[in-house]
Amino acid sequence: MEDPQSKEPAGEAVALALLESPRPEGGEEPPRPSPEETQQCKFDGQETKGSKFITSSASDFSDPVYKEIAITNGCINRMSKEELRAKLSEFKLETRGVKDVLKKRLKNYYKKQKLMLKESNFADSYYDYICIIDFEATCEEGNPPEFVHEIIEFPVVLLNTHTLEIEDTFQQYVRPEINTQLSDFCISLTGITQDQVDRADTFPQVLKKVIDWMKLKELGTKYKYSLLTDGSWDMSKFLNIQCQLSRLKYPPFAKKWINIRKSYGNFYKVPRSQTKLTIMLEKLGMDYDGRPHCGLDDSKNIARIAVRMLQDGCELRINEKMHAGQLMSVSSSLPIEGTPPPQMPHFRK
């Protein structure tokens, strides 16, 4: 997901390129320079310890912007963690996170600075809002395969992508209609009590409240938006099953969403095993805030990850969808699209 390279006379200070940005996503790392190809790498005229960069031939890349970006990336790749933090601090950027995250953050800072001179970043501003949803559902210890999960908490966190602030939240508990008694395991895991679900509305009633709330926010009409989840299960399993149980058609506005685990793994180049909520927070230098497995608290923490990723230059975009009742991936090569205005789905006949 990134790269390119520059044509500067050997021996001259091409470090000015480092003030501009890093390589675009999708390229390759520049090769390590040989002694005769290298010189000290500089940021704002200051040398980095032992960091070097290479000059490149004019035929390597057609656009000099990307040549400069590639040279910058090579320098950043060879910086120590302390150097990375110092440079990030200098630009008043977040300094928490593991080394790979710090490198990605600094590269994207330089990349954005340079590319802003060429063109506006369409994807960054495409969605005005992101709705983070993390359902809680009935469960039993060991999750036996025959157990039917019913949604018992419906939270939504409204993230403004321009201010990077949580603008509002929605939370409603839901009364289950098949397994009406919560298991001790479920109560302990989620913190949701039997009394809370007994006094709650049924799923169709809660879904109607969610949709009315989203309409008040003018999502899909005045503002472009997308849903975002931590994994595929919230939409492809929990919402899908719940709609069947409640005899509702699957709501069109929930057919496509951003799976932040996929976005995180692709952006920071980490394996799937490193994309659990607590691990993502840890790698970004953050602690979980709130009660784990509280749907609203989980959603707020997912929003914190989304904010950090946007700050680091990630283009959060729809990457999963439901089609004919099946989970499918959405290619990043397709045009970016928004989510339709929320509408209450019809009941099945």
From Swiss-Prot:
GO terms for biological process: exonucleolytic trimming to generate mature 3'-end of 5.8S rRNA from tricistronic rRNA transcript (SSU-rRNA, 5.8S rRNA, LSU-rRNA); maturation of 5.8S rRNA; regulatory ncRNA-mediated gene silencing; rRNA 3'-end processing. Changing P155L: In SEMDGC; likely pathogenic; loss-of-function variant unable to rescue defective maturation of 5.8S rRNA in ERI1-deficient cells. It is an enzyme of class 3 (hydrolase). Mg(2+) 2 binds at D134, D234. Its main location: cytoplasm. Changing K104A: Does not inhibit RNA-binding to the stem-loop structure. Does not inhibit RNA-binding to the stem-loop structure. The keyword Metal-binding applies. Pfam families: RNase_T, SAP. Changing M235A: Inhibits RNA-binding to the stem-loop structure and 3'-end histone mRNA exonuclease activity. Transmembrane segments: none annotated. The keyword Magnesium applies. The active site is at E136 (proton acceptor), H293 (proton acceptor). Keywords: Cytoplasm, Disease variant, Dwarfism, Exonuclease, Hydrolase, Intellectual disability, Magnesium, Metal-binding, Nuclease, Nucleus, Phosphoprotein, RNA-binding, RNA-mediated gene silencing, rRNA processing. It is found in: Cytoplasm; Nucleus; Nucleus, Nucleolus. AMP binds at E136, A137, H293. GO terms for molecular function: 3'-5' exonuclease activity; 3'-5'-RNA exonuclease activity; histone pre-mRNA stem-loop binding; metal ion binding; ribosome binding; rRNA binding. InterPro entries: 3-5_Exoribonuclease, ERI-1_3'hExo-like, Exonuclease_RNaseT/DNA_pol3, RNaseH-like_sf, RNaseH_sf, SAP_dom, SAP_dom_sf. The modification Phosphoserine is found at S59, S62. Mg(2+) 1 binds at D134, E136, D298. Residues 130-306 form the Exonuclease domain. It is linked to Hoxha-Aliu syndrome: An autosomal recessive disorder characterized by mild intellectual disability, eyelid ptosis, and limb anomalies including brachydactyly, clinodactyly, dysplastic or absent nails, brachytelephalangy, short metacarpals, and toe syndactyly. Spondyloepimetaphyseal dysplasia, Guo-Campeau type: An autosomal recessive, severe bone disease characterized by short stature, scoliosis, platyspondyly, irregular vertebral plates, facial dysmorphism, and variable anomalies of the pelvis, hips, and extremities including short, rudimentary, or absent digits. The SAP domain is necessary for binding to the stem-loop structure of histone mRNAs and to form the ternary complex with SLBP, but not for 3'-end histone mRNA exonuclease activity. This is 3'-5' exoribonuclease 1. The lineage of its organism: Eukaryota, Metazoa, Chordata, Craniata, Vertebrata.
